[in-house]
């Protein structure tokens, strides 16, 4: 997993009711981040979300629902915009294998 700067991963959720909040009641929901995920800078991931393997989350996104594997997802709320293709893998500079 590659996590860029200023990413917030939080499992805590609070009640809307002020009396419950003042009592300190909160719920923690698990977060699952798959293998080979890239999370862009400033992204917020909220409790209960699952990000599938090999997905890319765009900078500044708010992930509150599940993101499937092998997609590019962005936005507030974060949504998949498309599958990652073989062409995507060729588009950016390839580093020599002996440097990896």
Model-derived regions: residue spans:
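A generic membrane alpha-helix/interface feature
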Residues: 18, 66, 93-95
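Acidic/histidine-enriched, glycine/proline-rich intrinsically disordered or flexible terminal extensions
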Residues: 89-100
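Flexible, glycine/small-residue-enriched loop-and-beta-strand segment within the central core
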Residues: 1-49, 76, 84-85, 89
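Beta-rich strand-turn-strand
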Residues: 41-56, 61-65
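Structural motif
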Residues: 32-35, 50-54, 67-70
